[in-house]
Amino acid sequence: MSERTNSFGQPIGRELPGWLPPPRPSRRVLVGRFCRVEPLDVARHARELYDANSLDAEGRMWTYLFSGPFGSFEEYRAWLEPRPASEDPLFFAFVDERRAQAVGTGAYMRIDPANGVVEVGHLAFSPLMQRTPVATEAMYLMMKYAFELGYRRYEWKCDALNAGSRRAAARLGFTFEGVFRQAVVCQGRSRVVFGVGNPRAR
């Protein structure tokens, strides 16, 4: 907590000398050793993503997500069609370099340049991406880009019952900050949101 006080003796927050709001994330390609983070392109990525997602025959990957499962490629493509035009969320595809195939999607969302805060979300990792270096590196590349732009805080929120997502957040260096009860309705269910953050030093 702050040890600074104002002229009234009230505790106040730390000053941010020279603070300027960062630019919004742009549609650019982020290149790593195992993967590329590419702006979502329906014509280029839809079929590859659908095929990768379809390896989850039971549909387990969709349990805690707002979309899916999808019964056909046409249904998935129709859901995907408007996403590339969105500015917030700003969608990307995760491409496995070894396979040369899109294997997952994610987005920057709740983009708040004025306060230097951005959230990563809409994460849909196919079985080809789950628990692989591609998953770790894709999240690293997105986080790195946000901090390079000058964002002070990078957030990850998930269903409080999603143990896998909570473990992934902890492994990536996020810190648990609290639970938001009755925060969201997801697929007709009440969703308790598990909030974590990865604040920068300034």
Regions found by a protein language model. Give the residues of each.
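GNAT-family acyltransferases
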Residues: 1-132, 145-149, 187-202
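Short, conserved glycine- and acidic-residue-centered signature motifs
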Residues: 135
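Flexible ATP-lid and adjacent glycine-rich G1/G2 motifs of the Bergerat
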Residues: 142
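Conserved GNAT acetyl-CoA-binding A-motif
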Residues: 148-157
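Conserved beta-strand-loop-alpha-helix junction that forms the acyl-donor binding cleft
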Residues: 156-166
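Conserved catalytic-core motifs of GNAT/GCN5-like acyltransferases
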Residues: 157, 175-189
